[in-house]
Amino acid sequence: MNVSKYVAIFSFVFIQLISVGKVFANADEWMTTFRENIVQTWQQPEHYDLYIPAITWHARFAYDKEKTDRYNERPWGGGFGLSRWDEKGNWHGLYAMAFKDSWNKWEPIAGYGWESTWRPLADENFHLGLGFTAGVTARDNWNYIPLPVLLPLASVGYGPVTFQMTYIPGTYNNGNVYFAWMRFQF
């Protein structure tokens, strides 16, 4: 190997190491912001929220018909939360909810949600949101072992009433579920 190949290899490795350092620095910064948002929402909530599950829908393209015919798609239940709007107008919430799952068994979930919020109309009461939720759930068919969740969130709302939703990805006959609920802010 000539010297230029050594220089090229060294340069490539050096640049990769610098990039990894930046990624870890950004991850530290992101985790700090995440933790601070949770603490601020817990300590300084602007609203108390009531959660009412509305619909569970199993994507028909991802299930055998005999399975979907047996599944519960009316998730009875409810929940409570704390929330706030930040200086950018984004929503932050802490919540706990329990509902009847696909097998009509109780499923609890608790976590933190964040949505970037847009107000596209002249009427500032109308809002759209897109974000994520991170939390813990437990299911009967997993013996109620706590399971971490990281899921997308989307919403449409007017004033203190919001229709919020997520999609649980999965494989054939497992997951691929749209879940939505009403959130009332007080």
From Swiss-Prot:
Question: Reaction(s) catalyzed by this protein?
Answer: lipid A (E. coli) + a 1-hexadecanoyl-2-acyl-sn-glycero-3-phosphocholine = hepta-acyl lipid A (E. coli) + a 2-acyl-sn-glycero-3-phosphocholine; lipid IIA + a 1-hexadecanoyl-2-acyl-sn-glycero-3-phosphocholine = lipid IIB + a 2-acyl-sn-glycero-3-phosphocholine; lipid IVA (E. coli) + a 1-hexadecanoyl-2-acyl-sn-glycero-3-phosphocholine = lipid IVB (E. coli) + a 2-acyl-sn-glycero-3-phosphocholine
Q: Name one GO cellular component term.
A: cell outer membrane
| Pfam family, any one | PagP
E.C. numbers = 2.3.1.251
Q: Which UniProt keywords apply?
A: Acyltransferase, Cell outer membrane, Membrane, Signal, Transferase
Any one GO MF term held by the record is: O-palmitoyltransferase activity
Q: Which GO terms describe its biological process?
A: lipid A biosynthetic process
Site location (Role in the phospholipid gating): 172
Task: Please indicate if the UniProt record lists Membrane as a keyword.
Answer: yes
What are the positions of the active site? 58, 101-102
Cite the position(s) of the site with description Role in lipopolysaccharide recognition: 67
Enzyme class comes to transferase
Q: Where is the signal peptide?
A: 1-25
Q: By its UniProt entry, which SUPFAM superfamilies does this protein fall under?
A: OMPA-like
The keyword Membrane appears for this protein: yes
Provide the protein's localization: Cell outer membrane
Give the family, as the similarity comment puts it. Answer: Belongs to the lipid A palmitoyltransferase family.
Q: Its quaternary structure? A: Homodimer.
Any idea what job this protein has? Transfers a palmitate residue from the sn-1 position of a phospholipid to the N-linked hydroxymyristate on the proximal unit of lipid A or its precursors.
* Name by which UniProt lists this protein: Lipid A palmitoyltransferase PagP
> Source species, please?
Escherichia coli O157:H7
Gene that codes for this?
A: pagP
